[in-house]
């Protein structure tokens, strides 16, 4: 163990055991009604019979400090809306709200607002869970067409424990982390690619559980919900308005289950599927990535991009080279994540994003992989931290066996030519992680719920959307589902139409017509 790793490990141990201390964004806010669910009003209404709490401004606010430029620089972004302001802060949250485990974490938060945002406007809280640092997610949203959302209410991103600005988890040894980043593609073992992915996942699991035990499961979704409630208490407000994107929607649902009396608004944006095994979730994510890539191909052709008349064939050729190892040390998994990272973003102009990605991939095909390496590094920083590994493995239920991945491999490679093989392999890395209880889900909800889904979502896909909206419907509350016909993640990042609906919902819980569709 290096001196740096030892010091970081000691730091985590003290905190744990010490005393408690992209497809194009739309500028069109038009809404088309496609269908209505049975029993759901077909017009925007509020339900006076429901006792819906109001959003509140914090009574005791956090010690915010301006972090606008440092945040933009950290993620290579430029403001998408004039007057954009980022403020950063931290607060302490106990490792275990029940008191069974001692210690505390520092939880990082960031507030995004405009200079014109009313000072009395109550904040909405955003969590993207383990998908990516919530602060990074909010920064990307704010660098896009965010004026409609941020002009109405400030949005506060809360990083999940172990991720982003929150107390970092540093538990995987550098050599293991490098191998994990490539899913073992360049490991010296003579095993096949499936066994190599299992091996590196097991090594990372042993290293992290050895360091973090007996609190290795204190990074689950339910604990993230407790951190949300700790923010509520720090603010001195009765209830929160929560936007959960992707995996963060699971955190939002867990908060609704654990603290139903402290929830004022609930937006489920591109939620991860519930009640299914990890191979099903992996396939849903792959379907979303393929849909987002198809949208990129169409835009690329329309722009006469550098990938030529057949962008999909050109990228498939590049992926073949990566799989064969000719882009080493860049692995095929890193290339896949780099492409997905670019497709997810809503920052800046959609056409410019498409041209930039095309140029990066074209250069790599011509032998210059420098830009692709930079993109892969940004993707690894966004998706591949130790904290995310721990959180994702803790969240997961029903991880696949190596044989089930082998069985799916050929079918997925044919069905999903760009992303299929990688998705099946990625599902193996957490197979050795200790099983944690499933995240709690609400059986009743006393407030209306707004759910959003994108047609081309490269983060989670939309295959699990019906299950989530079905869960919400089963609670008996009013709800509305909106579909964005664009691509990217989350929906509020790319769709002004969806932002308009969220801003209106924040005021008095008014819902748009169920089944509404926002244009690409």
Predicted regions and their residues:
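C-terminal motif of bacterial Sec signal peptides marking the signal peptidase cleavage site
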Residues: 16-20
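N-terminal export and membrane-targeting signals
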Residues: 1-13, 240-241, 439
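Alpha/beta-hydrolase-fold enzymes
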Residues: 297-390
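Bacterial signal peptide processing site
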Residues: 22-25
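Post-signal peptide N-terminal segment of mature Sec-exported envelope proteins
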Residues: 30-55
């Amino acid at each position: 163990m290096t001196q740096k790793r030892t010091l970081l490990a000691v730091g985590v141990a003290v905190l744990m055991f010490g005393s408690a201390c992209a497809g194009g964004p739309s500028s069109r806010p038009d809404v088309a009604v496609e269908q209505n669910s049975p029993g759901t009003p077909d017009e925007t209404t509020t339900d006076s019979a429901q006792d819906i709490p109001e959003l509140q401004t914090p009574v005791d606010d956090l010690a915010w400090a301006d972090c606008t430029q440092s945040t933009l620089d950290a993620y290579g972004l430029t403001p998408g809306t004039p007057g954009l302001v980022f403020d950063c802060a931290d607060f302490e949250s106990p490792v275990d709200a029940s008191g069974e485990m001692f210690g505390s974490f520092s939880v990082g938060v960031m507030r995004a607002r405009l200079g014109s945002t009313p000072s009395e406007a109550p904040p909405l809280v955003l969590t993207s869970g383990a998908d990516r640092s919530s602060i990074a997610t909010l920064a990307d949203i704010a660098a896009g067409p965010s004026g409609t959302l941020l002009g109405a209410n400030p949005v506060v991103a809360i990083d999940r424990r172990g991720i982003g600005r929150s107390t970092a988890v540093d538990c995987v040894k550098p050599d293991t982390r490098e191998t994990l980043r490539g899913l073992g593609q360049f490991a010296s073992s003579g095993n096949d690619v499936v066994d190599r992915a299992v091996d590196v996942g097991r090594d990372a699991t042993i290293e992290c559980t050895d360091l973090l035990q007996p609190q290795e499961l204190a990074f689950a979704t339910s604990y993230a919900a407790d951190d949300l409630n700790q923010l509520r208490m720090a603010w001195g407000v009765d209830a929160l308005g929560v936007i959960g994107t992707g995996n963060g929607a699971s955190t939002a649902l867990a908060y609704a289950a654990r603290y139903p009396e402290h929830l004022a608004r609930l937006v489920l944006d591109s939620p991860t599927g519930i009640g299914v095994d990890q191979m099903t979730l992996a396939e849903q994510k792959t379907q979303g990535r393929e849909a987002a890539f198809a949208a990129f191909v169409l835009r690329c052709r329309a722009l006469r991009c550098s990938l030529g008349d057949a962008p999909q064939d050109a990228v498939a050729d590049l992926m073949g080279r990566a799989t064969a190892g000719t882009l080493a040390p860049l692995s095929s998994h890193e290339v896949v994540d780099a492409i997905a990272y670019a497709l997810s973003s809503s920052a800046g102009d959609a056409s410019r994003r498409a041209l930039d990605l095309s140029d990066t991939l074209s250069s790599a095909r011509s032998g210059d992989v420098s830009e692709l390496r930079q993109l892969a590094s940004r993707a690894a920083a966004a998706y591949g931290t130790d904290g995310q590994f721990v959180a994702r493995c803790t969240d997961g239920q029903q991880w696949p066996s190596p044989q089930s991945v082998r069985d799916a491999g050929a079918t997925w490679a044919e069905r999903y030519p760009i992303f299929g093989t990688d998705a099946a392999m990625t599902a193996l890395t957490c197979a050795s992680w200790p099983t944690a209880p499933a995240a709690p889900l609400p059986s009743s909800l006393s407030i209306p719920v707004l759910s959003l889904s994108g047609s081309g979502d490269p983060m989670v896909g939309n295959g699990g959307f019906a299950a989530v909206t079905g869960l919400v419907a089963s609670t008996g509350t009013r709800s509305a589902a909106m579909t964005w016909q664009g691509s990217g993640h989350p929906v509020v990042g790319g769709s002004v139409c969806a932002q308009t609906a969220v801003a209106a919902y924040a005021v008095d819980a008014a819902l748009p017509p169920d089944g509404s569709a926002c244009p690409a």
